[in-house]
């Protein structure tokens, strides 16, 4: 969206997009029952000789992607970088076409708006967003679902590979919040 450089930058510790956006706070609400999306696996076979250095020159690639994912993503506007990102999203002004993981999986960005939220520390209410592990103590007695997954939260400086953190999506009530929860459009959101 912002036009920052990515993986072709080999002379810096971090990639430009990460240097600029690593402090951006987001909250992600899966718009799928229980937060789980069906996955699809496709195997590609490229048998042209230059595709692989292996004997026989046959390259086999196995890809996995989510089927019809849908999230509502909230961006906390707190500095010039996040303000510019919000303005570009609202104006549908992207330097490059946004995509999900791979450029043949285009992102469909819709329903953009600027909203306000109220900072709270609720008890006996559910979180509507993904919750970083350790941010909330839950009462697991009455829950009907609990989805957990390790997701990328940053890059390692030495390798530019993902740093991951465990996230929880559940209908269990929050017992204690270690970080603020924002009430936005009737939803309880945690930012990370």
Give the location of each predicted region.
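N-terminal ordered "arm"
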Residues: 1-9
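Short, glycine/acidic-rich hinge or "gate" loops at secondary-structure transitions
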Residues: 9-19
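Internal, well-folded beta-alpha domain core
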Residues: 23-192
